Amino acid sequence: MRECISVHIGQAGVQIGNACWELFCLEHSIQPDGTFSDPPSSDDSFATFFRETSMSKYVPRAIMVDLEPTVVDEVRTGTYRHLFHPEQLITGKEDAANNYARGHYTVGKDKVDMVSDRIRKLADSCSGLQGFLIFHSFGGGTGSGFTSLLMERLSVEYGKKSKLEFAIYPAPQASSAVVEPYNSVLTTHTTLEHSDCVFMVDNEAIYDICHRNLDIERPTYTNLNRLISQIVSSITASLRFDGALNVDLTEFQTNLVPFPRIHFPLVTYAPIISSDRAYHEQLSVAEITSSCFEPNNQMVKCDPQQGKYMACCMLYRGDVVPKDVNVAIAAIKTNRSLQFVDWCPTGFKVGINYQPPIPTPGGDLAQVQRAVCMLSNTTAIAEAWARLDHKFDLMYAKRAFVHWYVSEGMEEGEFAEAREDLAALEKDYDEVATDLFEDENEAGDS
């Protein structure tokens, strides 16, 4: 088997975890107590995410960690309390108080050995561990500080195993702390060399999608997380179901990451429509494919027209045949002004999974016959870093709030180091897009 272990860290990670496991259970007909509602089919691909116990119960290969108990306690007492083994839910007594240094140096340090042991137990129950999916936010103290501490540890203990992150990018609408830019820059710097691929989700983009496409007046975290869980489900469907293509974690990297540091694909999902609208719309493969190139459906606010594509991966699910996909992609190539970098063939990697998306009961999304999730590596995503770096600079110029970090044992030099690394990352993106212009001009002159 090629198992994946999911690690949910901090409030955002755990709450997204709740939404994801609720959806995975629905998709695989597993009840909240871990038993099957329908007898399992011969396809046991779901075992990549669930482990069977001696009592024929299915337990998620997952761990939830938070440095304070309230959010994980909701799992311990909620509908899915019997799904997880108590040892998979780990909490501390005091939170990281939105402070990266507390999550990484003081409070987090005390917990990392225990978390590491629990992950080791999960890994030992796998026959061929493929890698880790790590869910967290950039802005929280636990999400930023503890995640980077744990990723360093995973790199040491499981060297070559893939590590993919689903990371929540801070947004003004749903901001929970003024120091989010500090935490985000620090965690990105620390995890850059440990992470293989990071799918960023910008809360502001998701907030707007819920508001605009799903007619939710004031979207809550529950609304946001349910939408995020559909995206995670699409990206991981090929690992959990027998599919035609894209079955492996390493395959994502091979197809999406041209250089080790340029590992932040842009995620777009379609169709995102409410039940009322779905009633009146028939969404063909061509239409949903075209929707993926609308900036309104992106999970991070940026303008792909201003950037260049390095790679594109289309993951379809439901009632989709390859012929329709080929026609749809050919139309995109002719109708849209997609700019690919010169050194990259304009091939689209396609995955098709025949399992249609299942909406959560009582959720906001309509039941549709087919959906697509596009993962594209585009230089436009550097805009997200530029926004974050700008906010970091405004505060750091005044050294605002820095004493809270230093008093937790962090050195002030780490701020400058992290900021320089992100400046280098922005420059890397620039070079990927522009280096080749110079070559063209020289070729044109000669």
Swiss-Prot record:
SUPFAM superfamilies: Tubulin C-terminal domain-like (SSF55307), Tubulin nucleotide-binding domain-like (SSF52490)
Transmembrane segments: none
Enzymatic reactions: GTP + H2O = GDP + phosphate + H(+)
InterPro entries with a match to the protein in the record: Alpha_tubulin (IPR002452), Tub_FtsZ_C (IPR008280), Tubulin (IPR000217), Tubulin/FtsZ-like_C (IPR037103), Tubulin/FtsZ_2-layer-sand-dom (IPR018316), Tubulin/FtsZ_GTPase_sf (IPR036525), Tubulin_C (IPR023123), Tubulin_CS (IPR017975)
Gene Ontology MF annotations: GTP binding; hydrolase activity; metal ion binding; structural constituent of cytoskeleton
Active site: 251
Biological process terms in GO annotation: microtubule cytoskeleton organization; mitotic cell cycle
Any one GO cellular component localisation term in the record: microtubule
Tissue: Testis specific.
Positions with a binding annotation for GTP: 11, 68, 137, 141-142, 176, 203, 225
EC id: 3.6.5.-
Subcellular location: Cytoplasm, Cytoskeleton
Main location: cytoplasm
Residues annotated for Mg(2+) binding in this entry: 68
Placement of sequence motif MREC motif: 1-4
Family: Belongs to the tubulin family.
Function: Tubulin is the major constituent of microtubules, a cylinder consisting of laterally associated linear protofilaments composed of alpha- and beta-tubulin heterodimers. Microtubules grow by the addition of GTP-tubulin dimers to the microtubule end, where a stabilizing cap forms. Below the cap, tubulin dimers are in GDP-bound state, owing to GTPase activity of alpha-tubulin.
UniProt subunit comment: Dimer of alpha and beta chains. A typical microtubule is a hollow water-filled tube with an outer diameter of 25 nm and an inner diameter of 15 nM. Alpha-beta heterodimers associate head-to-tail to form protofilaments running lengthwise along the microtubule wall with the beta-tubulin subunit facing the microtubule plus end conferring a structural polarity. Microtubules usually have 13 protofilaments but different protofilament numbers can be found in some organisms and specialized cells.
Domain notes: The MREC motif may be critical for tubulin autoregulation.
Note: This tubulin does not have a C-terminal tyrosine.
Protein name per the record: Tubulin alpha-2 chain
Taxonomic source organism: Gallus gallus (Chicken)
